A protein has these predicted regions:
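Ferredoxin-type iron-sulfur electron-transfer modules and their immediate structural context
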Residues: 158-291, 339
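Short hydrophobic/aromatic-enriched beta-strand-loop microsegments
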Residues: 468-475
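A general structural motif
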Residues: 477-485
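Iron-sulfur-cluster electron-transfer modules
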Residues: 1-69, 76, 210-219, 241-245, ...
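Short acidic (Asp/Glu) and glycine-rich catalytic loops that position anionic groups and cofactors
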Residues: 152-153, 225-229, 291-295, 311
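Membrane-embedded alpha-helical bundles of multi-pass integral membrane proteins
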Residues: 1-205, 248, 253
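Conserved small/polar residues in nucleotide/adenosyl-binding loops
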Residues: 487-489
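Charged, low-complexity surface segments at secondary-structure and domain boundaries
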Residues: 155-156, 232-235, 298-299, 318
Length: 489
């Protein structure tokens, strides 16, 4: 619910529908239980019945207000993410839900009129007012017809659930409950050690069977709200990537290629012709390479769909199985393999940033590793990029002044492999990662300070997949702790 409420208007609208529907459903179940009770155990009487009736009236107001609000957003609203995916099915679904609510009111109005408007029914203020307004000549017939229509519309609603977007009523909560808890949010899915594999038939995802069951459940859980697309920086800058379309297209391939084929949640413009369960019949490589892997889509999704995981898995297939990647990436891959950094700079220049410091920066090795509390992980940008080198110098200077004992790996430090992994080249990532892990484990490194957020995430959240378990702290965290310790003194 917290994610839903990030968009305040849409969040309030959904909350009204959700709370109203649950209230009315609970009220209906309670009424049926009451009817099944023997006379001595009936409980909807006196004050209890008045509170019950009044509560259901409030639930009805919330439910219908939310539904009419949702209908207005589609009819007269201008929000792009809503307008582009509004279909006839949406109007029919909302109309059905509104009819269920209104037929419930008319059923109640007929019953109250049939009982000749007793005073205690004034607490059912909507049904009471509607009954008086209609001035029914045959309240019994009106009540029966309204009740039958109400029941029929509810059964139509039940039938529509698996055939429409309404399925998310069930699939979304299940999907949220089944979201992986053990894997850190910043970590990519581990697919095994490729360097130790004897035979590799496939890496990444190309066909529906390559996706995990949880990734496929994501497809059915999608509410097509478009929040992911609205926060996607690639989409906002005119790139071809549309995170919502990625989910819908893979969902369509899954639905149409399954046995038997079932309707997809929502279709994209134009007829769907799928000749196989290959997702690249619907998704282009340009869409996938436009992704910056920022994870904004995952963070904003109200039902915990992991969109980035699917994009990265498809990238893995393109990069390693098809060699289908931008030329610029090919150069970076070669540089990372040959020079251990994306720019092809010499490893001998890893310590060049220390040359004009007024103190020595020690390099850790087998003979001195016990003298230092922290390994300072400089990173490729921190060592080679002209804009980042001043940051490296400043961090080292502050650590020295604070009395923190630290050392660096120097030429032994190689790229963490984050760029390779995020762009699909799992093989290069694992080569670099295992080299770093073996070096640090041999030096018995336990605590690491990083300044690059990419290095922080990779070492802290992804190196454990390959046997690298360290206490990793970002320089901003450590410096904050040091400042706070001085304040407390």
């Amino acid at each position: 619910m917290r994610t839903v409420l990030r968009f305040k208007a849409a969040g309030l609208m959904h909350s009204l529908i959700y709370i109203g529907f649950l209230g009315l459903f609970a009220g209906t179940v309670t009424l049926e239980i009451h009817h099944l009770m023997p006379p001595s155990l009936k409980f909807l009487q006196g004050t209890t019945y008045i509170v019950y009736s009044f509560t259901l009236e409030l639930a009805t107001i919330a439910y219908l207000t939310g539904l009419f609000w949702a209908l207005a957003r589609r009819l007269i609203g201008t929000e792009y993410r809503i307008k582009t995916k509004t279909t006839v099915d949406d109007y029919l679904t909302l109309s059905l839900l509104i009819f269920i609510g209104i037929s419930g009111i008319t059923t109640e109005a007929g019953r109250i009129a049939l009982e000749n408007f007793p005073d205690y029914e004034k607490w059912s203020f909507i049904g009471y007012a509607v009954g008086q307004f209609l001035n029914l000549s045959n309240p019994e017939l009106f009540h029966r017809v309204s009740w039958v229509l109400h029941v029929i519309s509810f059964f139509v609603f039940l039938i529509a659930i698996p055939l429409s977007k309404l399925r998310h009523i069930f699939t979304s909560p299940i999907n949220m409950f089944m979201s992986p808890k053990e894997r850190p949010k910043g970590a990519m899915k581990f697919i095994g050690n490729l360097l130790e594999a004897d035979d590799i038939d496939n890496v990444g995802t190309e066909i529906i069977d390559h996706f995990t069951w949880k990734q496929l459940m994501d497809l059915d859980a999608c509410t097509v709200c478009g929040r992911c697309t609205s926060v996607c920086p690639a989409n906002q800058t005119g790139k071809s990537l549309d995170p919502r379309e990625i989910i819908l297209k893979v969902g369509q391939v899954m639905s149409e290629s399954g046995q038997p084929a079932v309707p997809a949640t929502v279709s994209t413009p134009g007829p769907l012709r799928v000749n196989s369960d290959n997702v690249f019949e619907r998704i282009t490589s340009e869409e996938l390479w436009a992704c910056t892997s920022c994870k904004a889509c995952d963070e904003i999704c109200p039902v915990n769909i992991e969109i980035l995981d699917k994009i990265l898995d498809m990238r893995r297939h393109l990069a390693l199985m098809e060699s289908d990647f931008p030329a610029e990436l090919g150069k970076a891959y070669v540089a990372m393999e040959n020079s251990s950094n994306p720019w092809g700079a010499s490893q001998n220049d890893r310590l060049k940033w220390t040359e004009d410091l007024d103190f020595d920066v020690p390099v850790i090795d087998e003979s001195n590793h016990e003298e230092y509390d922290y390994l300072y992980w400089v990173g490729c940008a921190g060592a080679f990029d002209d804009r980042n080198v001043p940051v490296t110098k400043a961090v080292a200077t502050l650590l020295k002044r604070a009395g923190v004992t630290f050392a660096v790996l120097g030429p032994k430090e190689v790229c963490t492999g984050d760029s390779a992994r995020r762009t699909g080249n799992e093989f290069v990532f694992q080569q670099l990662a295992i080299q770093n892990i073996e070096n640090m484990n041999n030096l018995k490194v336990e605590k690491i300070i990083t300044q690059c957020p990419h290095c922080f995430n990779t070492i802290a959240n992804e190196y454990p997949q390959l046997g690298g378990n360290y206490q990793v702290i970002h320089h901003s965290q450590l410096l904050t702790e040091l400042v706070l310790s001085l304040i407390h003194i």
